[in-house]
């Protein structure tokens, strides 16, 4: 697979779980809002039992629907890799291997989706149903005791969920990670494993004795010294085992192609590899800060993630009638305009497919534009996203942002 093909597969794997996450966040936010409006303890206990029962059913239905979607997506991703790697007349062993990888990945993804966790208002990560109950209890308790007003209590109960999304627990480290990133990482790792298996089969069938690592611009620092190089079998295996990120795994855009040493000439000259390195190091300057080309790509991804988080927050705000809705709508337009400005300045294409959130359509986008236009100047101050300051923008920059076209997520 090429770096471009890997990037496309990675985007598809990341987007796969978005509908489930966004649907559940909206559902939970709506129920927390109702819980906060109840002041009688007995009435709340009745509502709590009913809401948790309905919520559990909603979670099960959303996850079940998502599993069906995910299994179709996973099958299509593995078919894509096989189609790019196998000729029609290949024997059935590699095709059977592709089917086995597909089944294994579908099974693991089902496990991940059935083990959802979320942040509670107290800052702890709990199983989703428990976190759901904690959020409702928090909103009710704070309002009933007069500790917080209704809007503040609901905002504090819902914000951790909207900000951090649905999560899963890594078995090795015990850390919680976003479910969409956990699924993407696992799927891409399995796709990489399948590609490795196919390449090794080609290696043996052709009588090869070495490997050549592909090369691309804007390379990560840990792989830049080795890209474009040829290695004997033993040398390559030793090198790959020494890497924290093996070739073709963990968001690596490289591939290792089988070669016959001394027969297959390198695909890249030393001058071409040096130009990749020099261009990356020279990088770009934006707002007085120098980025390598690789760092610019990472910054672009951080802003894209920030935009998705703000959109989720807006959807939760709408369900809970949060008075901060306008503030978040303004923030969205500021960050969207900054995204367009950053990409144009550093020479990167905007990636609208990475900004999509299920349920956030044209109406939400238009309301965000209107809120921005009505905002007083003091509301258009600088904002921070993902730990980075983004600067307020002008009407000209807002007009430069392409009109959102996304109205939903297709299951096709």
Task: Give residue ranges: language-model regions.
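Contiguous, non-catalytic segments that form substrate-binding/exosite surfaces or channel walls
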Residues: 114-206
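N-terminal leader/targeting and assembly helices and adjacent pre-domain segments
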Residues: 1-154, 271-412
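Acidic, glycine-rich two-metal-ion catalytic cores of nucleic acid-processing enzymes
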Residues: 169, 177-274
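Noncatalytic linker/hinge segments flanking ATPase motor cores
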Residues: 159, 255, 263, 296-303
């Amino acid at each position: 697979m090429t770096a471009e093909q890997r990037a496309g597969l990675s985007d598809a794997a990341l987007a796969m779980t978005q509908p489930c996450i966004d649907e559940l966040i909206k559902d939970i936010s709506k129920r927390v809002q109702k819980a906060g409006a109840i002041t009688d303890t007995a009435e709340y206990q009745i509502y709590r039992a009913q809401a948790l029962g309905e919520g559990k059913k909603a979670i099960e239905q959303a996850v079940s629907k998502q599993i069906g979607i995910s299994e179709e997506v996973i099958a299509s991703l593995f078919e894509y890799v096989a189609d790019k790697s196998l000729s029609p007349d290949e024997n059935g062993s590699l095709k059977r291997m592709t089917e086995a990888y597909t089944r294994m990945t579908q099974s693991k993804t089902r496990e991940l989706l059935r083990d959802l966790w979320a942040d509670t208002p107290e800052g702890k990560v709990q199983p989703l149903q428990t976190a759901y109950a904690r959020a409702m209890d928090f909103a009710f308790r704070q309002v009933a005791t007069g500790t917080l007003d209704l809007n503040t209590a609901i905002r504090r109960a819902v914000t951790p969920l909207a900000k951090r999304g649905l999560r899963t627990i890594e078995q090795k480290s015990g850390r919680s990670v976003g479910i969409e990133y956990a699924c993407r990482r696992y799927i891409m790792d399995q796709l990489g494993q399948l590609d490795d298996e196919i390449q090794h089969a080609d290696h043996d069938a052709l009588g090869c004795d070495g490997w050549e690592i592909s090369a691309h611009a804007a390379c990560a620092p840990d792989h830049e010294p080795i890209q474009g190089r040829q290695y004997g079998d033993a040398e390559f295996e030793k090198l790959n085992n020494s890497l924290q990120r093996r070739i073709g795994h963990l968001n690596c855009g490289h591939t290792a192609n089988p070669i016959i040493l001394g027969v297959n000439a390198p695909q890249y000259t030393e001058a071409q590899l040096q130009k990749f390195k020099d261009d990356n190091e020279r990088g770009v300057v934006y707002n007085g800060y120098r980025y390598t080309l690789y760092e610019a790509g990472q910054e672009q991804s951080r802003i894209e993630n920030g935009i998705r988080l703000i959109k989720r927050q807006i959807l939760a705000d709408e369900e809970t009638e949060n008075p901060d809705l306008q503030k978040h709508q303004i923030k969205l337009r500021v960050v969207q305009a900054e995204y367009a400005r950053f990409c144009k300045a550093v020479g990167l294409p905007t990636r609208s497919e990475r900004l999509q959130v299920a349920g956030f359509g044209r109406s939400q986008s238009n309301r965000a534009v209107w809120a921005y236009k009505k905002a007083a100047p003091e509301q258009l101050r600088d904002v921070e996203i993902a730990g980075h300051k983004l600067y307020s923008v002008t009407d000209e920059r807002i007009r430069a942002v392409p009109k959102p076209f996304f109205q939903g997520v297709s299951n096709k």
